[in-house]
Amino acid sequence: MNNKNLTPTVWPSGIGIGWRPDIAGVVAALPGLGFCEVIAESVPAVETAESWLPDLLAVDVPIIPHGVGLSLGGAEPVSAERISVLTRCAQILDAPLVSEHIAFVRAGGVEVGHLLPVPRSHEALAVLSDNIRRTQDFLPVPLAVENIASLFEWPDDEYSDGEF
């Protein structure tokens, strides 16, 4: 599905927060909250959000599925199955967009269990761009990408963090 002509009815703006059920009361009382993120991989396979997010829906802010497992920066193409998780979440939550990290989380079929920084090279940038484009082509809403805190630098980086 290509969504380049879609115009969301509500763009999230302002300050957002990552949703956790144990902070539902705090979130509900936050003044001026612009949006909430929900970890996409934790969204159950249900048809509506009412059955599992009633407290968040009561806050009445846009809910953004936030992925942590696409591995956009990985050398392997992004899995269609993982993209379908984001698609399903966007549909269930009536989300104006979805987001994911600029990171890699697997290589050679091995999940590392952590968001790892992408080497800042020409080659890695080309792979990242292809993976973002491929992912966006199958999503029903725009994809926002978020950088991660790099805890280390790759020895052969060709760009600074800001340039990349």
Regions found by a protein language model. Give the residues of each.
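Structural preference for beta-strand elements that scaffold enzyme active sites
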Residues: 12-16, 34-37, 60-67, 95-99, ...
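Short, basic, glycine/proline-bearing loop/turn elements
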Residues: 9-11, 34-40, 67-73, 117, ...
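Acidic (Asp/Glu)-rich catalytic clusters
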Residues: 26-31, 47-65, 81-96, 133-138
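Acidic-and-aromatic substrate-binding clefts and catalytic sites of carbohydrate-active enzymes
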Residues: 22-25, 39-51, 71-81, 151-158
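Boundary/entry segment of secreted carbohydrate-active catalytic domains
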Residues: 2-27
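Structured, acidic catalytic/metal-binding patches in enzyme active sites
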Residues: 59-60, 67-78, 102
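Active-site acidic/histidine proton-transfer and metal-coordination neighborhood
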Residues: 79-164
